[in-house]
């Protein structure tokens, strides 16, 4: 069979499979428009490739694709030439969203879906290019090493770093452990004090507590009610024996962005190292390690639509920062992290980083627009409030308190929306969020808070669906609550002394 005949047969088969999937959804939901809207999600992210990758796939500018022009993304019709790339699995996945079998995803702080462009870049390294990147005696190793170094360059360019300053790890948790423990142990003969913040990620807090058990002193700075630190308190906390200050870029629960540039200036003046956990900020907001005087940084791939299981530590070379390695072995990654790299993961990370850099302004504008729509809709519900600073924040993380409602009950009632009441790393605990407690929220308000994540593939239809369903569920739960009856009668609950919770 000729190449053209084979292509036509393949396209016909895909169209037949898509038609079957759409028939299944029509029978279940009787609403083809919803299916087209749901498929629009895949149309933007998967069926239509980036102009930089495959110009022939789409001639529409990203502004229109993300709803930044006259047409919103959910209203965009499916291009005819895109149907040939839709598989049955993709169609059924999209279809299952509108039939209630697969919830809408709004937990982007926990993880993000793998961008299909990232997957495409990874596939050759599972079977075809399978060499060990550390094998330097044959072509298989050279080819894998070249791919790894290209990815290292792409990852470094996002934060204006030297590629030699990027050390690959298994993720941000390992990077935080390696950096904090490594820098403290290397300089312990001269400096035994570190400074951090009460609202840091749990892996940072636990790493610092482990160092306390080794004899180090740690100062945990409080935050203001908006979630930001007081720079004067930071300046006063730094001592002559302080080795490192660790402040996260974007908080994973309330989305506040700390003033990295101002913190970096203080640390440089005081001659202490500045570390930032940027897992939630890398590739999403502008971060320049040189302009901000950042010496150490932790980043992760799966927060930026890359694969899970791969991350990196940025370690400045000039002025040089020394670390005592956590993992010993073959001396890979300049002796700081031994172990064979997985080229497929590294390449996926590099592709995700490149896409984030190229499309950051489009993603940020798209997410900001949807974030404001979500906030306006949810704050229209009585007795609700936004947690964290309303201006200095990443718009993709929206944390709302719904007074007189238990957050766990609200989550259980929203089965068609994938949400979280806080960090995925502590979601198994029923204790109130330590981040919300740190900004002054009561136990009751902390328990009533929900975190909404907005990402690259979120649509206006999903935002409106979330607003409608959250409003309905909050009203339902409040009508069941005796506390709500007291509030409706004008009783100030803060004046009541409860014998038990």
Swiss-Prot record:
What GO biological process term is on the record, naming one?
A: [2Fe-2S] cluster assembly
- List, in alphabetical order, the Gene Ontology terms for molecular function in this entry: cysteine desulfurase activity; iron-sulfur cluster binding; metal ion binding; pyridoxal phosphate binding
> Can you tell me which residues bind [2Fe-2S] cluster?
425
Which coenzymes or cofactors are required?
pyridoxal 5'-phosphate
- Entry-annotated residues carrying N6-(pyridoxal phosphate)lysine: 303
Main subcellular location? mitochondrion
Catalytic activity entry: (sulfur carrier)-H + L-cysteine = (sulfur carrier)-SH + L-alanine
Q: Which InterPro entries match?
A: Aminotrans_V_dom, Aminotrans_V_PyrdxlP_BS, Cys_deSase_IscS, PyrdxlP-dep_Trfase, PyrdxlP-dep_Trfase_major, PyrdxlP-dep_Trfase_small
- HAMAP family associated with the record: Cys_desulf_IscS
Q: What does this protein do?
A: Catalyzes the removal of elemental sulfur from cysteine to produce alanine. It supplies the inorganic sulfur for iron-sulfur (Fe-S) clusters. Plays a role in both tRNA-processing and mitochondrial metabolism. Involved in the 2-thio-modification of both 5-carboxymethylaminomethyl-2-thiouridine in mitochondrial tRNAs and 5-methoxycarbonylmethyl-2-thiouridine (mcm5s2U) in cytoplasmic tRNAs.
Name the EC number(s): 2.8.1.7
What protein does this entry describe?
Probable cysteine desulfurase, mitochondrial
Q: Which SUPFAM superfamilies match?
A: PLP-dependent transferases
Domain of life, per UniProt, equals Eukaryota
What are the protein's UniProt keywords?
Iron, Iron-sulfur, Metal-binding, Mitochondrion, Pyridoxal phosphate, Transferase, Transit peptide
Q: Which GO terms describe its cellular component?
A: cytosol; mitochondrial [2Fe-2S] assembly complex; mitochondrial matrix; mitochondrion; nucleus
Give the active-site positions: 425 (cysteine persulfide intermediate)
User: Where on this chain does pyridoxal 5'-phosphate bind?
Assistant: 172-173, 252, 280, 300-302, 340
């Amino acid at each position: 069979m000729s190449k053209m005949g084979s292509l036509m047969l393949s396209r016909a088969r895909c169209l037949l499979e898509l038609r079957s999937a759409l028939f299944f959804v029509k029978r279940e939901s009787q609403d083809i428009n919803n299916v087209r809207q749901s498929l629009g999600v895949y149309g933007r992210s998967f069926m239509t490739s980036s102009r930089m990758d495959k110009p022939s796939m789409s001639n529409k500018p990203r502004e229109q694709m993300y709803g930044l022009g006259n047409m919103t993304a959910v209203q965009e019709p499916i291009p005819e030439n895109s149907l040939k790339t839709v598989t049955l699995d993709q169609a059924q996945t999209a279809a299952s969203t509108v039939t209630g079998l697969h919830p809408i995803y709004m937990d982007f702080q926990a993880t993000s879906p793998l961008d299909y462009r990232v997957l495409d870049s990874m596939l050759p390294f599972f079977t075809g290019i399978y060499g060990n990147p550390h094998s330097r005696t044959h072509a298989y190793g050279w080819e894998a090493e070249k791919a790894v170094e290209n990815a290292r360059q792409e990852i470094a360019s996002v934060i204006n770093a030297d590629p030699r300053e990027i050390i690959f790890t298994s993720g941000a948790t390992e990077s935080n452990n390696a950096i904090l423990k490594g820098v403290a142990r290397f300089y312990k003969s001269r400096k035994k004090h570190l400074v951090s913040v009460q609202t840091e990620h749990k892996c940072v807090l636990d790493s610092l507590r482990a160092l306390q058990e080794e004899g180090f002193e740690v100062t945990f700075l409080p935050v203001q009610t908006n979630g930001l630190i007081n720079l004067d308190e930071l300046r006063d906390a730094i001592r002559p024996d302080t080795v490192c200050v660790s402040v996260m870029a974007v908080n994973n629960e309330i989305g506040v962005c700390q003033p990295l540039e101002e913190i970096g200036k203080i640390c440089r003046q005081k001659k202490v190292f500045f570390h930032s956990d940027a897992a939630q900020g890398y590739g999403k907001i502008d971060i320049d390690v040189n302009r901000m005087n950042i010496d150490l940084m932790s980043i992760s791939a799966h927060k930026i639509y890359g694969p899970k299981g791969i991350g990196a530590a940025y370690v400045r070379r000039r002025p040089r920062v020394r670390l005592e390695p956590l993992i010993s072995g073959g001396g890979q990654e300049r002796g700081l992290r031994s172990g064979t790299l997985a080229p497929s993961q590294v390449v996926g990370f590099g592709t995700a980083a490149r896409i984030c850099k190229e499309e950051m302004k489009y993603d940020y504008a798209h997410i900001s627009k949807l974030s404001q729509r979500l906030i306006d809709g949810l704050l229209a519900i009585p007795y609700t409030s936004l947690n964290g600073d309303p201006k200095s924040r990443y718009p993709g993380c929206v944390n709302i308190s719904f007074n007189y409602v238990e957050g766990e009950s609200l989550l259980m009632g929203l089965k068609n929306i994938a949400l979280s009441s806080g960090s995925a790393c502590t979601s198994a605990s029923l204790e109130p969020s330590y981040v919300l407690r740190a900004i002054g929220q009561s136990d009751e308000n902390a328990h009533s808070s929900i975190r909404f994540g907005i990402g690259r593939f979120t649509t206006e239809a999903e935002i409106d669906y979330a607003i409608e369903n959250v409003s309905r569920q909050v009203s339902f739960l409040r009508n069941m609550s005796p506390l709500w009856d007291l509030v409706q009668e004008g009783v100030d609950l803060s004046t009541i002394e409860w014998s038990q919770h």
